[in-house]
């Protein structure tokens, strides 16, 4: 899924990668291969971390993955959830994340409150190399409304079922009916990786 940000003098294409974790199944391996391909082609990697907690094995794995996959790209660490961080932990937690990617730019951010979001956006645009615009100014995604609906359903399912189904879920849109008003009727099938999750 691509999100397109266009300003007066720049255009950034954001590609959300699958989570980077140790693969156990074919789906995991495919997701990791997809993430690797995206990072290899990236000019800038925006790594969003939860700074309210210390980095663990997963964060170390992601840092290593980024650095080994594309040594030449710039990395920007958005240390999210700074609004949940206890004041006495600001320096220690941010230092731990900066140590994982010493060359990375970084900033504390609260996506919930909007703290530093505009600054990060502008920093990323400044890091991009000169190149052509690939999309018209009014385009914000390469997905159709039908595809976005599937993503929203998957996000909701993962939110409500996150303890039962960590990430192995896909959404197939069976019917997508738009009426003359603002209503859309959607029939979808949720596909899970493991049969015990049905």
Regions found by a protein language model. Give the residues of each.
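Canonical P-loop GTPase G-domain recognition
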Residues: 67, 72-76, 82-147
